[in-house]
Amino acid sequence: YPDLVCFDADLAGATMTKYFKAACPERFFDMGIAEADMVGVAAGMSLCGFKPFVNTFAMFAAGRAWEQVRNSVAYPHLNVKVVGSHGGLSVGEDGATHQCIEDFAIMRAIPGMLVLCPCDGNEMRQAVEALVGYEGPAYMRLGRLAVETVTDSIPGYKFELGKGATLRDGTDVTIIAVGMNVQMAL
């Protein structure tokens, strides 16, 4: 994907975008601790035909950069993907100011914004592939902690944007979960 570019807010070690930086340094942009500006620059690069993936902690994506995500990315329906890592309550070590549980609600309230939260590494890889092919704004929440791979045990498992997946059949109850909560629900 030569048109894919990666933006990070001085968190490449924590968000793991350091691997993209090592593989494609000419398409990696460390914007420092300036999340709102990072989203604005990504919106501009989208208008130039690039496919920007903006990476920061969920708290900063849905907090500090919310207005730019809403006005500069989602309303004009630009092809920018916002990845909020360290979402939810799994970031206890980082303190309460970094625990973001409202990011789903905030991002989903924006008209035209696709919101997703993969349950494991396998689903995340498939979700990123799907997002590269999706034309429009999207928000993907990732957790901080390592999670058990649950989708590898499902023969022919295929992630699809906008669709849920039945991971275990049953007859007495339906449990709906996303992200790292899927392994707990199973």
Feature-to-residue mapping (PLM):
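A short, charged/proline- and glycine-enriched loop
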Residues: 1-2, 168-173
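Thiamine diphosphate
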Residues: 1-141, 146-147, 157-158
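A short, charged helix-loop
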Residues: 152-153
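Glycine-rich phosphate/diphosphate-binding loop of Rossmann-like nucleotide-binding domains
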Residues: 174-186
